[in-house]
Design a protein with these regions (language model features):
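Short beta-alpha connecting loops at secondary-structure transitions
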Residues: 373-377, 403-413, 442-451, 470, ...
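Short pre-active-site segment immediately N-terminal to the catalytic Zn-binding motif
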Residues: 313-316, 369-389
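C-terminal, non-catalytic "cap/extension" segments appended to globular domains
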Residues: 4-7, 14, 20, 115-119, ...
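Catalytic zinc-binding patch centered on the HExxH motif and its immediate surroundings
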Residues: 314-316, 349-371
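Long, K/E/R/D-enriched contiguous segments that form extended
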Residues: 293-331, 337, 341, 363, ...
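Post-HExxH zinc-binding segment in Zn-dependent metallohydrolases
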Residues: 412-440, 448-450, 454, 530
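A well-structured
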Residues: 1-311, 599-604
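Active-site recognition of the HExxH zinc-binding catalytic motif
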Residues: 250, 379-399, 420, 425, ...
Length: 605
């Protein structure tokens, strides 16, 4: 970066809570633990709502208010330690605090179980009576209904409590182990003639020099293979624990729970993947044209993020990326632009490219502070800028919901990914409209269509892999070698066998942290869902040509906290997600972008 940087690349955590190394934070955590234990004990005697008498409703209202306050504090603590641990992956103190907070999981399970078991006995009529008979409960009527639905994923009370206690040193411990292993991993690469060790997040595959991409790629494969056995244990035991519980619950299959968590019907998931499989062949035109522009017969895995040849092949500074995002969001709506500037200026974002950070990116919320924090590693590419816009989109979603009751600020991951990918769409379309020449427009379209490949092919390969892995895991542990075979098989199917024969990534099951998130299963299809939903919404905005669309979009974001996925879209935009129409509308946008890219790529202007 040339000259003095305008925007800080490091976040401000000190204004949120006391630093973890001090006594004040220790005291804060101890008080939280005590209050959590007391409320968990109180929850054991929470009455059933099978007979919603006025005194019972009042007791529930008071309990839910206490739970609201305690949940805010606990969420802030989790997010705070998570931020510190991500920014300093090898810090043992932060790892210890992560483990300590995880150990409180059984108390939280007691609380959520008490709510769900208490609601389980209530009929629809009783639940409606309950919400109309108490104003405070009426405000969170949808959340109560959703909690009653989630009670189907609960074992009998004593078994549920035992499972929660065992998960601390089982399910969630395997997730934490993966975080430590991947955080400590170093990839040995060549930089400017020197051999250096880099964190996974620092090793990029977007160099204009193919030899650099190939060397980085093969170095990454070698490094990840060195931890294959440990990661194989982790992924097997995470999946195995879940499958054991699913069997005890009598669930249809391993997709039942993810669908519950995403407030989504199986017909919707099937309609989405069916549309993707029927239409994604159009992406072969993009992959072929990009290979031609790069002088290759076929793209390999290391070429998917490669930049196109351009007379202006320089990167984009963090300051420039921030200004572009602010300007693009502001043209959509002043509130969106003002919010983006707020996150950047007030240092809600950590982007510094340095050793010792965890890989990946995230946005995490602090409901007690009504703020968010964003984590990523910015490496000066268009893809980095898109990731930044993506995470700011997440933060804006939380910002819109911040005045709602806490339990109506919770939204499923598929709808969370809609707001973030919509932000990327806003940035991309604004930049494309302002593109000055063929090379610039090709570069913008390349970024957009690389995202399409990620969401419609890469994420699909993850879904196919996890689906088949879970089916095989029912019969016992799956070896690392077999996991690699399943990964390549899934990639070939999802990418329509379009990459070079030696271009498949058999270590992707090891390097992709989404497979190891112990708190949520099948953390893959929400991305494709959110991507296509955001494109469809953007198409509605483009076609409507109405100045009131930003307000409709805001109402859509508010609805994500108090409706099912299908009702959120139906009430906001009038589409039935169980039918192919909306998904095809989204895929029409992708097809149009491919046509524009292929035409520009074949032009000599």
């Amino acid at each position: 970066m040339n000259g003095q940087a305008t925007f800080s690349q490091n976040w401000d955590l000190d204004s949120l809570l006391p630093h973890p190394s001090g006594d004040e934070f220790r005291q804060l955590l101890d008080v939280f633990r005590t209050d959590l234990e007391l409320l968990a004990e109180e929850s054991d005697s929470l009455p059933s709502l099978g007979d919603p008498l006025p005194e019972v409703l009042e007791r529930w209202a008071v309990f839910v208010e206490k739970l609201d306050e305690l949940t805010r504090r606990g969420t802030d603590l989790d997010a705070f330690i998570g931020c510190h641990a991500a920014a300093d992956a090898n810090n043992r103190l932060y790892q210890q605090f992560e483990a300590e907070l995880s150990s409180l999981g059984p108390y939280r399970t007691r609380l959520s179980s008490a709510i769900q078991f208490g609601l389980q006995a209530a009929s629809d009529e009783q639940l409606a009576e309950m919400c109309s008979g108490n104003e405070r409960l009426g405000r969170i009527a949808y959340w109560l209904k959703d909690q009653r639905s989630l009670s189907k994923l609960r074992l009998p009370r004593e078994q549920e409590m035992l499972a929660a206690e065992m998960d601390v040193d089982g399910l969630h411990a395997w997730g934490r182990l993966y975080d430590r292993v991947s955080g400590a991993l170093r990839i040995r690469v060549m930089e400017k003639g020197d051999v250096v060790d880099r964190s996974p997040g620092q090793v990029q595959f977007d160099s204009a020099d193919r030899s650099v991409r190939e060397n980085n790629y093969h170095a990454s494969l070698k490094a990840w293979r060195s931890v294959a056995d440990t990661c194989g244990d982790a992924i097997n035991h995470i999946a195995g624990t879940r499958l054991t519980k699913y069997r005890r619950l009598g669930l249809e299959d391993h997709l039942s729970a993810p669908l519950f968590f995403n407030r989504m019907q199986r017909e919707t998931l099937d309609a989405m993947w069916s549309a993707v499989e029927n239409r994604k062949e159009v992406l072969l035109g993009f992959l072929g044209s990009k290979a031609d522009l790069l002088g290759l017969d076929r793209l390999g895995w290391c070429d998917l993020q490669a930049p196109l040849p351009s007379p202006d092949a320089g990167g984009i500074s963090y300051d420039a990326a921030c200004e572009l995002i602010i300007e693009s969001f502001s043209r959509f709506t002043p509130e969106f632009g003002d919010f983006a500037r707020k996150t950047i200026v007030e240092r809600w974002i950590e982007v510094e490219n340095r050793d010792g950070k965890r890989q990946g990116g995230f946005c995490t919320g602090f409901p007690g502070q009504q703020q968010s924090r964003i984590f990523m590693t910015y490496v000066g590419t268009l893809d980095s800028m898109s990731t930044l816009a993506h995470e700011i989109g997440h933060a804006y979603h939380s910002f819109v919901l911040k005045e709602q009751p806490l339990f109506l600020q919770e939204y499923p991951m598929n709808l969370a990914e809609t707001a973030s990918t919509f932000a990327e769409a806003v940035l991309g379309e604004e930049r494309l409209a302002a593109g000055q020449d063929r090379h610039e427009q090709l570069g913008i379209l390349d970024t957009m269509l690389s995202d399409a490949v990620s969401f419609l092919m890469n994420i699909h390969s993850r879904f196919l892999f996890e689906d088949e892995f879970h089916r095989e895991r029912v019969d016992g542990e799956v070896s690392p070698e077999r996991l690699s075979e399943l990964m390549v098989k899934s990639q070939k199917q999802a990418y329509l066998d379009a990459l070079a024969e030696d271009g498949w990534n058999d270590t992707f099951w090891i390097s992709k942290l989404h497979f190891y998130i112990s708190s949520l299963p099948f953390y893959n299809f929400p991305y494709t869902f959110g991507y296509l939903l955001s494109l469809g919404i953007y198409a509605v905005a483009r076609d409507a040509g109405s100045v009131d669309f930003p307000s409709r979009y805001r109402e859509f974001l508010l609805a994500t906290g108090n409706r099912s996925t299908e009702d959120t879209v139906k009430d906001s935009f009038g589409y039935d997600l169980r039918e192919p129409d909306f998904w095809n509308r989204s895929l029409d946008v992708v097809a149009d972008r491919v046509r524009r890219f292929v035409d520009l790529a074949s032009s000599n202007d």
